[in-house]
Amino acid sequence: MTVSLPSHSVSRDAPDRLMLNRLPARAGIGLKPEHFRAILHNKPDIGFFEIHAENYLVAGGPFHQALTTIRQDYPLSIHGVGLSIGGENPLNQTHLQRVAALVERYQPAVFSEHLAWSTHNDLFLNDLLPLPYTDVTLTRVCEHIDQVQNALRRPILLENPSTYIEFSASTMSETDFISEVVRRTGCGLLLDVNNLYISGVNHNRCPRQMLLELPLHRVGEIHLAGYTESRDGANDLLLIDSHDSHVTGPVWDLYNKTLRKTGPIATLIEWDSNIPPLDVLLNEASHAQHYITESKKHATTTVSSTS
């Protein structure tokens, strides 16, 4: 059975937002095998865990054994990295069905993917590559998202990318492109605040202004991560989305401004390289939780002052 989802206009009222916010408005962390033992033994007070779908596409093994137990105690988010939603080629149906089976097995609160491409013909590239923002690309991305949502029988969240180059062929901005994808497909937005900051700095744009141009009423989850500073060929500052360090001060500041606009949203700390001890991730999550709690107070104060 497949479910037909809207291909054009979607409602922007409160029920849409509630449907996308199925994770608790708390901070979570990525579930790493290095931490399985500590999590199973200590059961830390954390809002949710997130996994990369492609790490769990086999039928069994120790990853599934640990996840099955952990899933009993925590909400789960599944994050895809290999569907190549922005690719020129048709979606790999075998891969899509394996992802759908994983979603059916664990019933995560949300499923998300990237606005990027990573395959071309039979070639798989171990990266998330940018795409031109054109009408042709827009149509293709929307068709791919419709296919994924039908296969998974649910709306997905689409993550804004971190980019290092732009295409002269683009006819619209990244924020306009994302807004139109959300409008046409009914998907939600996984707002990666780190990516937003990186792309703004790399392309000499104001990250805060970019934030205001996004469909914030459709945010179902937020990502935070660390970046690395580098230099391009012209010796200009280039930020790299490395996911291997603490969240930086400017990203925390942009995150705080985000929550003042959206209200409390489930927030993930991403740390995918140079994995630290679990306590380090829990401390980062605690910092995010502080901002979430403050945003709840701000929302309550705002409502009270307008009553």
Curated annotation (Swiss-Prot):
Pfam families: MbnB_TglH_ChrH (PF05114). Belongs to the UPF0276 family. This is UPF0276 protein plu0081. The lineage of its organism: Bacteria, Pseudomonadati, Pseudomonadota, Gammaproteobacteria, Enterobacterales.
